[in-house]
UniProtKB/Swiss-Prot annotation:
Pfam families per UniProt: Fapy_DNA_glyco, H2TH, zf-FPG_IleRS
Gene Ontology biological process terms from the UniProt entry: base-excision repair
Function: Involved in base excision repair of DNA damaged by oxidation or by mutagenic agents. Acts as a DNA glycosylase that recognizes and removes damaged bases. Has a preference for oxidized purines, such as 7,8-dihydro-8-oxoguanine (8-oxoG). Has AP (apurinic/apyrimidinic) lyase activity and introduces nicks in the DNA strand. Cleaves the DNA backbone by beta-delta elimination to generate a single-strand break at the site of the removed base with both 3'- and 5'-phosphates.
Complex and partners: Monomer.
Alphabetic keyword roster: DNA damage, DNA repair, DNA-binding, Glycosidase, Hydrolase, Lyase, Metal-binding, Multifunctional enzyme, Zinc, Zinc-finger
Origin species: Mycolicibacterium paratuberculosis (strain ATCC BAA-968 / K-10)
Active-site residues, as the UniProt record annotates them: P2, E3, K61, R269
Keyword Hydrolase: yes
Record-given protein name: Formamidopyrimidine-DNA glycosylase
Cofactor requirements of the protein: Zn(2+)
Length: 283
């Protein structure tokens, strides 16, 4: 699933190319792609017709397009395999929605697995930020200029569950998924099974700092692409997968100490870690 860096790459691409454009005809090719828009496909297409895009924003793994003259936004969730693509004509297989812009560009939403989608949502003011209603419950993410690491540390010190589980909780800190949780924990030399409440404030701060650092590094390299499912708006893959220190490296040498990297099951996922740098906590 695209995580914060991948979604931010897409948002930046959209911001550069669609802000100031007016939406013309919109076609929903697969109704599942707008299933979260409760009023249905016809309502979404009618309300988007003639709307001018005035900006883009993001929180965690959600991005949205701001529309002129209304207090609603077009919210996009990429799900497992969603792609926002720009081109003269719909250019991808699995195109679920397409929108013609006034300069002739087609904005396409492609989604092989159909877990993502578009919806229109009301904008609300939450803690000094203007957010779409479906996003309002999400915590700030580590790349948010107003992210308060000290406040998050206070929350984590009350959590009697694994630190990795807390990193994946979008109401504690948003935008972090399995890949970047493993990468942050490796950089901070912390095993994901450590109970958050047993960690010091300094240790928890180090984990949050590592999460921000690794996501900035990934963003600089266009995100992480293991296959063709994640691409930017031009259909290009990111290349941070070549720089991963933990995720997917079972059986390889730790880049820091040389120990053999391990994998273990965690929440129907896999966790990758170094047994020497990140010793498992004692029960």
């Amino acid at each position: 699933m695209p995580e914060l860096p991948e979604v931010e790459v897409v948002r930046r691409g959209l911001h550069a190319h669609v802000v100031g454009k007016t939406i013309g005809a919109v076609r929903v090719h697969h109704p599942r792609a707008v299933r979260r828009h409760e009023a249905g496909p016809a309502d979404l297409t009618a309300r988007l017709l003639g709307a001018r895009i005035t900006g883009t924003d993001r929180r965690g793994k959600y991005l949205w397009l701001l529309l002129d003259g209304c207090d609603t936004a077009l919210v996009v969730h990429l799900g497992m395999s969603g792609q926002m693509l720009l081109g003269a004509v719909p250019r991808a297989e699995h195109v679920r929605i397409s929108a013609l812009l006034d300069d002739g560009t087609v904005l396409s939403f492609a989604d092989q697995r159909t877990f993502g989608g578009w919806m229109l949502a009301d904008l609300l003011e939450v803690d000094g930020s203007i957010l779409p209603r479906p996003v309002a419950h999400l915590a700030r993410d580590p790349l948010d200029p107003r992210f308060d690491a000290a406040a998050v540390v206070k929350v984590l010190r009350r959590k009697h569950s694994e630190i990795k589980r807390q990193l994946l909780d979008q109401q504690v800190v948003s935008g972090i998924g399995n890949i970047y949780a493993d990468e942050a924990l490796w950089r901070a030399k912390v095993h994901g099974a450590r109970i958050a409440a047993t960690m010091t404030g300094r240790q928890l701060t180090a984990v949050l700092d590592a999460a921000a650092e690794v996501m900035r590094d990934a963003l600089a390299q266009g995100g992480t692409s293991f296959d063709s499912l994640y691409v930017n708006v031009n259909g290009e893959s990111g290349y941070f997968d070549r720089s991963l220190d933990a995720y997917g490296r079972e059986g390889e040498s730790c880049r820091r100490c040389g120990a053999v990297m391990r994998r273990e099951k965690f929440m129907n996922r896999s966790s990758f870690y170094c047994p020497k740098c990140q010793p498992r906590p004692r029960l």
